[in-house]
Amino acid sequence: MIVAADAPIAHGTARLLVVSDRGDLEHHGRDQLADLLRPGDLLVANDAATIPASLGGIHERSGSEVEIRLAGRPTLRADDVHRFVAVVFGTGDWHTATEFRPQPPSLLPDDRLRLGPLRATVTRLLDHPRLVGLDFEGDAAQVWAGIAAHGRPIQYAHVPRPLALWDVWTPVAARPVAFEPPSAAFALRWATFSRLRARGVGFATLTHAAGVSSTGDPALDARLPLDEAYCIPVRTARAVRQARRQGRRVIAIGTTVVRALEHASLATGEVRAGAGTATGRVGPGTALRVADGILTGVHEPATSHWELLLAFADDATLARMAGELDQAGYRTHEFGESVLLLRGGRGE
């Protein structure tokens, strides 16, 4: 596999590896997606837009430079700016790989941070010295204006050029609540929707606040994904229920959609409309209630994204998939190529 180092790759050259429910592997162009689905299938995408969640500033008690990466909130409500979760880095920025970033100064509750025009207070440490609760000073309008003016998209060292905010907005980006892009939706473009409609494939959206994908700290990375707020519209819940009752497949576009759909179905087995917070992890021990398949990016083994795929297929199938992706030189990470993995995936 090859790191995709720009945003995003041209649709005409992007590839799609399809892993059937029997475990068969086939290579296609990503622009053939609609032709690879069945009439009646329902695609569900995350329409969250990404906010500029990286904030540089000063830790007042020590005078040290820090980078704050906002990573979560308990709600999608715009007026709630007092309960952020954030990952704290020491000096430097995205040019340095996260695993080589310096540690931040020792953090304590009530420490104050100066982040450009913003002021924030550390409310608590979240069982890790770099994971904190943050409370911003000011009302919601002031805080969001400050984030817009001072923040920049969270970015990793494998992309060498600075990313603009529009680089991390997918074609269906709407409500600005994500901390990193729900990048599986980069596989979509406007022509895709025309082809899906002509094929008789349904399309629906939900909003899920995608969090950070990596911190560079093994202990903290092992806790990813963190709790993430979501909202499922009534029309989407209805479309999913109808598809399930009629025996049609529900294909999630990305891991965040899987988390939201599965969490929203825990109580009754049917997806409920409304707001919630996805907790826990989807993985090899998860009995999926809703998602029959996932359209996802090319992820590397031993990541939280990869672990979620084990709910769809066993280790042996994913190992063959990884070998095929590696041999064919598929491009990885948020701006890379795609995989369509259908539940089952147990075959030779």
Predicted regions: what they are:
Residues 1-348:
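A cross-family signal for N-terminal binding/gating loops and helix N-caps
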